């Protein structure tokens, strides 16, 4: 395994955590130290079966004017209607029953975990493994979130990591806050996104029947889980008004989930410190982490995309890590990959911006 030693830390018999330890600085040959030069994007990866989310600094944008934007008017209209409906939903919150507000919040949390613990840390990055009951829960939660099916989301996200801040990055933050937040969903993909994304190895997800099942039945799935169910449950179960159910539990909740996720692509790439790698754009943003339940420690995540915690500090403003650890305690999650403290400190010293408390 290039550049790393693996140690298996056994907690209970059903739970393992793979810890990444820093490699030796060189190897001895004929009594002398032979220094090996290893590209940074290969030096710190620990998954021999997974390279598609590792940053490739050799890729550069082609020179020349960017292609003309092609607006997707269907998406523009639907997003506008959603957010107008969500704003109206805010005015209805005071008239909602307490159960409706609690239901909307729980639905929000489950949806966020379908993104953070599900399509992001499990399926996009393979930072841990999940047994079938947990995978079923996460695929349902991901469908509730309605942010494209797991296969498409993971393909775009792997391209985002591998070709970060280039035209092959689906939500390139160097094209501005609005584009990286939501604008990328309102226009046709840049040709480089299609070209490079189409060449990524997605065989792991193609081989997973659950992921392909969701993709096959995604449209009826989102209609049921994202819109029909959250509207009918408050209305039918505790007599909430239909308008409150639709505008608060459905539209407002859905809009909040979307924007909490989008802020990881926009704000967490533009605002904050870069204690782990000052040479990349992603930042540490605690407010983003609060809304996304752990995805805002973005400089760390792009430096170590294979760490299941997506943060140096595990449970600190990181409910998703807490959730995964709880699932591990129940025997539903295992092989959680974790970067060792020594490796983190070495990276801070080598490429950090000096803002880390370790100095």
Curated annotation (Swiss-Prot):
MF terms from GO for this chain are: metal ion binding; palmitoyl-CoA 9-desaturase activity
Protein name (record)? Acyl-CoA desaturase 3
- Report keywords, A-Z: Endoplasmic reticulum, Fatty acid biosynthesis, Fatty acid metabolism, Iron, Lipid biosynthesis, Lipid metabolism, Membrane, Metal-binding, Microsome, Oxidoreductase, Phosphoprotein, Transmembrane, Transmembrane helix
Which ranges sit in the Lumenal compartment? 94-97, 238-241
Listed binding positions for Fe cation 1 are 120, 125, 157, 161, 301
Domain of life of the native organism: Eukaryota
Q: What is its EC number?
A: 1.14.19.-
Name the protein family: Belongs to the fatty acid desaturase type 1 family.
Mind listing the GO biological process terms from this record?
monounsaturated fatty acid biosynthetic process
- Pinpoint motif Histidine box-1 by residue range: 120-125
Q: What note about domains is in the entry? A: The histidine box domains are involved in binding the catalytic metal ions.
Q: Which InterPro entries match?
A: Acyl-CoA_DS, FA_desaturase_dom, FADS-1_CS
Could you tell me the gene encoding this protein?
Scd3
Tissue-wise expression: Detected in skin, but at lower levels compared to Scd1. Detected in the middlle part of the sebaceous gland, but not in hair follicle. Not detected in liver and brain.
List the residue ranges of the region (Disordered).
Answer: 1-34
Sequence motif Histidine box-2, location on chain: 157-161
The positions annotated for binding Fe cation 2 are 160, 269, 298, 302
- Catalytic reactions on record: hexadecanoyl-CoA + 2 Fe(II)-[cytochrome b5] + O2 + 2 H(+) = (9Z)-hexadecenoyl-CoA + 2 Fe(III)-[cytochrome b5] + 2 H2O
- So where does substrate get bound? 75, 148, 155-156, 188-189, 262
Which enzyme class, named as a word? oxidoreductase
Subcellular location per UniProt equals: Endoplasmic reticulum membrane; Microsome membrane
List the CDD domains hit by this protein, alphabetically: Delta9-FADS-like
Residues where Phosphoserine is found? 203
């Amino acid at each position: 395994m290039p550049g790393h030693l693996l140690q298996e830390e056994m907690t209970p018999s059903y739970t393992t955590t793979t810890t990444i330890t820093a490699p030796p600085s060189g190897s001895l040959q004929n009594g002398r130290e032979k220094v090996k030069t290893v590209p940074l994007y290969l030096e710190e990866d620990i998954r021999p079966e997974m390279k598609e989310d590792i940053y490739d600094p050799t890729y550069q944008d082609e020179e020349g004017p960017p292609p003309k934007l092609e607006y997707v008017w269907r998406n523009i209209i639907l997003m506008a209607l959603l957010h107008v409906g969500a704003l109206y939903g805010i005015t209805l919150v005071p008239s909602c029953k307490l159960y409706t507000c609690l239901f909307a919040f729980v639905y929000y949390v489950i949806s966020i975990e379908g993104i953070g613990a599900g399509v992001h840390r499990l399926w996009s990055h393979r930072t841990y493994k999940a047994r079938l009951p947990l995978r079923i829960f996460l695929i349902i939660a991901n469908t509730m979130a309605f942010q494209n099916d797991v296969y498409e989301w993971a393909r775009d996200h792997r391209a985002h990591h591998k070709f970060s801040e280039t035209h092959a990055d689906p939500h390139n933050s160097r094209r501005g806050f609005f584009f990286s937040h939501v604008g990328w969903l309102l226009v046709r993909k840049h040709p480089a996104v299609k070209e490079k994304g189409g060449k990524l190895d997605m065989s792991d997800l193609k081989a997973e029947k659950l992921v392909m099942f969701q993709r096959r039945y995604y449209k009826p799935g989102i209609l049921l889980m994202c819109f029909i169910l959250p509207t009918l449950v408050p209305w039918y179960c505790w007599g909430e008004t239909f308008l409150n159910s639709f505008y608060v539990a459905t539209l407002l909740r859905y809009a909040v989930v979307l924007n909490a996720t989008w802020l990881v692509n926009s704000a967490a790439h533009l605002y904050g410190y870069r204690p782990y790698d000052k040479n990349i754009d992603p930042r540490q943003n605690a407010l983003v982490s609060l809304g996304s339940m752990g995805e805002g420690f973005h400089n760390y995540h792009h430096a170590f995309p294979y760490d299941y915690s997506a943060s140096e500090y595990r449970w600190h403003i990181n409910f998703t890590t807490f959730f995964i650890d709880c699932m591990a305690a129940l025997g539903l999650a295992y092989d959680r990959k974790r970067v060792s403290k020594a490796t983190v400190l070495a990276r801070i010293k080598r490429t950090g911006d000096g803002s880390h408390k370790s100095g």
